[in-house]
Structure formats: structure tokens, C-alpha cells
């Protein structure tokens, strides 16, 4: 993980509740909503999906805002994005998130090609954002 500059490091106080946007409102999103209730340091506040009806349904079910992907990426209130898209989209979505100025947590795999994964790591390091992917959810 890249070292964080003072501005970004200050956003990681122990008392901060991170506001998170979710991209990809399929079945795995349900797992994140169920699991996130056990944590007090982040709150999912909005969702987006290429299928706007799926985003609207998810937003209504979990009482959050439904947005387009562009709206989510441009939302200054959101600190980080959960990338829950299909594996073939992980690279492109994570790249857009990093370029929009947000931290990103991606479902596995980080990318479908090793070189694309290395590119994301380099971009996160260059932009000084956290890029995370983990096999175990909670």
C-alpha cells in the first residue's frame, strides 16, 4: 500500500465514519449490506449500477440514495467506493474510481490480467489512494 500524504492520512482518524458508495447492485451487494451493520466505522450511503432499476431497488431496500456511476464518482461526500461489479469490469471501474479521487475496495479478482492489476496498484500509489481487494469479506 502506498504511503499516504498528511491530508489523506488525517482522514483516517479512529473516530471517522467513512461514507461509502457501492457500484454493482447484484447478489453480492446483499452480503455487504448485511455485514456492514456490524461495523461502526463506515456507512454505505449510495449505490449505482449500469442497470438503473437495480440501483433504484437496492437504494429503496436499504434506504440509501440511488445514483448513476458518474454521480457517485463525483459526489464529494463519498470517501470510498465498493466495486462489486462483475469480474470483467473490476479493472475499468477501479481505475475510474481512483482517477475520480476516491479510495476503492474491489471484489476479487482485482483484474482479470496480471498486468492490469499491476497498473491499478501503480495508479493507486501515484494518486496516493488505497486500493484494496480481499478474499474474505468479514
Task: Name each model-derived stretch.
Residues 46, 57, 79-80, 130:
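Short, Asp-centered acidic motifs that coordinate Mg2+ and/or phosphate
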Residues 2-62:
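N-terminal Rossmann-like dinucleotide-binding module
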Residues 45, 65-67, 132:
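General small-molecule cofactor/ligand-binding pocket signal
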Residues 119-136:
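Rossmann-fold dehydrogenase core element
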Residues 50, 115, 137-138:
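Short beta->alpha linker loops
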Residues 89, 109, 132-138:
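Rossmann-like NAD(P)(H) cofactor-binding subdomain of soluble oxidoreductases
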Residues 42, 102, 129-130:
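Short, well-ordered coil/turn segments that N-cap beta-strands
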Residues 64-123:
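Beta-loop-alpha module in the N-terminal Rossmann-like domain of NAD(P)-dependent dehydrogenases
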Amino acid at each position: 500500500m502506498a504511503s499516504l500524504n498528511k491530508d489523506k492520512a488525517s482522514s483516517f482518524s479512529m473516530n471517522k465514519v467513512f461514507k461509502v458508495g457501492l457500484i454493482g447492485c447484484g447478489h453480492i451487494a446483499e452480503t455487504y449490506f448485511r455485514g456492514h451493520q456490524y461495523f461502526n466505522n463506515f456507512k454505505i450511503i449510495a449505490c449505482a449500477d449500469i442497470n438503473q432499476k437495480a440501483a433504484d431497488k437496492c437504494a429503496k431496500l436499504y434506504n440509501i440514495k440511488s445514483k448513476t456511476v458518474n454521480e457517485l464518482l463525483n459526489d464529494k461526500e463519498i470517501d470510498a467506493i465498493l466495486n462489486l461489479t462483475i469480474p470483467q469490469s473490476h479493472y475499468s471501474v477501479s481505475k475510474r474510481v481512483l482517477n475520480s479521487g476516491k479510495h476503492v475496495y474491489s471484489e476479487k479478482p482485482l483484474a482479470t490480467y496480471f498486468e492490469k492489476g499491476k497498473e491499478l496498484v501503480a495508479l493507486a500509489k501515484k494518486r496516493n489512494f488505497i486500493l484494496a481487494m480481499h478474499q474474505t469479506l468479514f
